[in-house]
């Protein structure tokens, strides 16, 4: 599949800055994968794939992030996962023949590396490490989706707002998140007025400061204390880039990836 018409940015065939996930690969594996990687700058709001499409690209965020959403009847989508430089998005059934049920949108614009799914799976057939990369990325998406389902059911909008902001900040590696309160409201499935009220309360406490199209975290400890425990469950030690380096939430059994009961 070619580049989506929704994606903008000049595409180059080489780039010297890898993502956190790509940096976790061995030199030999990185060279194997690098033969087919392309790089581009994608803008916020760009649609990476739509529900019902045969998404055939895998995306490695370098300085941006992708929001994975389940679309609703009114055309909006509820976010179930955020993929930043710690992971990759686009690992579906692998055949390219089964339409995907989610929508992926660039949550934070930036640099991305992409590869055709067919080319990735061809390389993975020669390299066990790439098979593990795909497995931990799928497990990370599943963990986020499961935890988000729980979070949306049992936690308050305030706690979820704080969790979302922290998670996105971690994914981007920055305390300034370029996002509108309207976008957060849509991602969390809450009213815009509710998101505005929560942001105002946090700003009065000095926890965050809000500007046009951006939110800056001023008191991370305070924000963490206000967030639900889903934030710690989805912490950096569970990210695909860390799992490739060894340890973490998942363990490997006969080539498969499963939950590590020791964590």
What does each model-found stretch correspond to?
Residues 38-42, 48-51, 167-171:
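Small beta-barrel nucleic-acid-binding modules, principally OB-folds
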Residues 108-109, 124-191:
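Polybasic "coupling" helices that flank or enter modular domains
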Residues 46-108:
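Cyclic nucleotide-binding regulatory domains
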Residues 167-263:
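Phosphate-/nucleic-acid-contacting segments
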Residues 65, 110-112, 214:
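Structural motif
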Residues 81-139, 143, 147:
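Cyclic-nucleotide recognition modules
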Residues 1-43, 88, 93-95:
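Cyclic nucleotide-binding regulatory module and flanking cytosolic helices
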Residues 25, 61, 83-84, 107, ...:
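A conserved hydrophobic position in a structured secondary element of the catalytic/binding core
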